[in-house]
């Protein structure tokens, strides 16, 4: 990618003034990347994402990464930063740029940033998507615990 095109990966600051514009761009990429993600993006779920962005940005725990190629946003992902761990929450990319593996590279560059910042763990959270294993993930047991009286 570096040798073939002009690209940039960066984190955006989420504020009350910037949240709508940045999250709409994230939602666009998320919806483009799969029909399931597009269907998931109801008004209620979008409002939830915006609320998360504002709440966790206030404590610098929310990271919204965008990748641009020639000035156009082509991939994005959200990570939470918590107690020395980056937690990959959700992502999206433009499938027209899939030949450049922009979705995978967007995530790989967040791992690179985590290493640069001396983050101790990068957690892909639930799911067995193939890209997670391409980036070095290993399975962990995840348990649901229900406590009742």
PLM segments and residue spans:
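Feature representing long, continuous alpha-helical segments
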Residues: 47, 104-108, 130
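Conserved acetyl-CoA-binding loop-helix of GNAT-fold acetyltransferases
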Residues: 98-112
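Active-site/acyl-donor-binding loops of N-acyltransferases
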Residues: 65, 69, 117-149
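Short, basic, helix/turn surface patches
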Residues: 10, 111, 148-149
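Short glycine/serine- and small hydrophobic-enriched flexible loop segments
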Residues: 51-54, 109-115
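A conserved beta-strand-loop-helix scaffold within acyl/acetyltransferase catalytic domains
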Residues: 1-99
């Amino acid at each position: 990618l570096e040798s073939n095109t002009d690209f940039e990966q960066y984190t955006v600051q989420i504020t009350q003034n910037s949240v709508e514009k940045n999250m709409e761009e994230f939602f666009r990429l998320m919806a483009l990347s799969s029909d399931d993600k597009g269907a998931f993006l109801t008004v209620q779920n979008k409002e939830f994402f915006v609320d998360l962005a504002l709440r966790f940005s206030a404590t610098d725990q929310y990271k919204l990464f965008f990748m641009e190629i020639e000035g156009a946003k082509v991939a994005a992902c959200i990570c939470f930063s918590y107690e020395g761990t980056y937690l990959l929450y959700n992502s999206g990319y433009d499938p027209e740029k899939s030949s450049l593996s922009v979705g995978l590279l967007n995530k790989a560059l967040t791992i690179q940033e985590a290493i640069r910042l001396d983050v101790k763990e990068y957690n892909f959270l639930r799911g067995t998507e193939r890209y997670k294993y391409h980036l070095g993930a290993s399975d962990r047991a995840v348990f649901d615990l229900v406590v009742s009286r």
